[in-house]
Design a protein with these regions (language model features):
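Catalytic-core signature of thiol
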Residues: 1-153
């Protein structure tokens, strides 16, 4: 921990009580993002090195989008290796809020993703594929009819 703390410039390393008493193996079961199979990998990435100079030294999404108070909330995955699902639903909810300037504020269901996106997403609490979760959202959005006006958020 001291070696990590020596390199930290904007944060302080410390022990997290959440993992107190757990073995390394138990902690590793919580890291559920699996390496993606070749057929699932996203297409080629764009590289814009000239834009790297435009990246600010500090950026706090909570301050940049105050109309989206869910940004920065941390959910507890308990003993389930579902970080891949939590990350996907949290970022999708944040993106919906940002895109609509705060008019759509939803907490998407991690449980729904874990229960409904089976083969494409992985193995639930035993790990999964973040790309599969994003593809699942895309399919849902493309195939679902819009909700009636009375149910729209």
């Amino acid at each position: 921990m001291q070696a990590v703390a020596a390199k930290a410039s904007t944060w302080t390393a410390g022990k997290n009580q959440r993992f107190h008493g757990m073995t390394l193996g138990e902690v590793k079961t919580l890291m559920g993002a699996l390496p993606e199979p070749a057929e699932m990998k996203a297409g080629p990435r764009s590289n814009y090195p000239e834009e790297l100079s435009l990246i600010p030294k500090n950026f706090d999404a909570r301050k940049h989008w105050p109309q989206c108070p869910q940004i920065g909330h941390i959910r507890d995955q308990s003993t389930c290796g579902s970080c891949w699902a939590f990350g996907a639903v949290e970022s999708m909810g944040d993106r919906l809020c940002i895109e609509t300037n705060g008019t759509v504020q939803v907490e998407l269901s991690t449980e729904d993703l874990l229960s409904c996106c089976l083969i494409q997403c992985g193995m639930g609490c035993n790990g999964g594929f973040p790309t599969g979760a994003w593809r699942f959202f895309k399919v849902c959005l493309e195939q679902s009819p819009p909700p009636p006006a009375s149910r729209r958020v």
